[in-house]
Amino acid sequence: MQKASHKNKKERGVSNKVKTSVHNLSKTQQTKLTVGSLGLGLIIIQHGPYLQITHLIRKGAAANDGKLQPGDVLISVGHANVLGYTLREFLQLLQHITIGTVLQIKVYRDFINIPEEWQEIYDLIPEAKFPVTSTPKKIELAKDESFTSSDDNENVDLDKRLQYYRYPWSTVHHPARRPISISRDWHGYKKKNHTISVGKDINCDVMIHRDDKKEVRAPSPYWIMVKQDNESSSSSTSSTSDAFWLEDCAQVEEGKAQLVSKVG
């Protein structure tokens, strides 16, 4: 009986040690954040199967709250358990949340370390910086500095002056130029206008071979008659020669008739 009680005490001690170790590994932190114009104010990366906070955006909801820290791993956002979520799935979840919504955020603290490449790049993250609006006084001071610097550098060579010349700030907004489509520029059909010269000269593209002494004669009715007879006859060479002979005879007869009419 004493041995059995001693074993039970040992098992209880081991179980208590396991519980405390598990509790240390799963140390959690919980807070409530109000969604603002900057969202939750968190910069999150996907570290393996987890979503880990790397930086807090200045003046964001998380930075103003002060309870979340870089390195925390997200457990749940609102009613959604985000363990195993990808960044794409997490973004789809946040798209349905409007500004002013209060979300309960639950994270693991001291669970995994931030990757080394993400620890010292705060200055390279554009979301962590905010644009500083320049006043007209600052613009005037910048212009004065540019003119004084150009006066001090009068002894500098002309090439260096052109190379390192500081142009004054310009407040005029220039519209962005629409980029040219590569497919249209490379594969587009380009129309080319080609002119073709037609004439009697040898240098023309199309040369007309024509004798001005001979008049252009209209087709004779005799040719039609002989052509119809030619379809029924077997010899084509004799019919064509007869046709030209009949046509010439007809023109000779017409010439004689005109001479007789003039004489009379």
UniProtKB/Swiss-Prot annotation:
Pfam families reported for this sequence: PDZ
SUPFAM superfamilies (alphabetical): PDZ domain-like (SSF50156)
Ranges for domain PDZ: 30-109
Name of the protein in its database record: PDZ domain-containing protein 9
Record organism: Homo sapiens
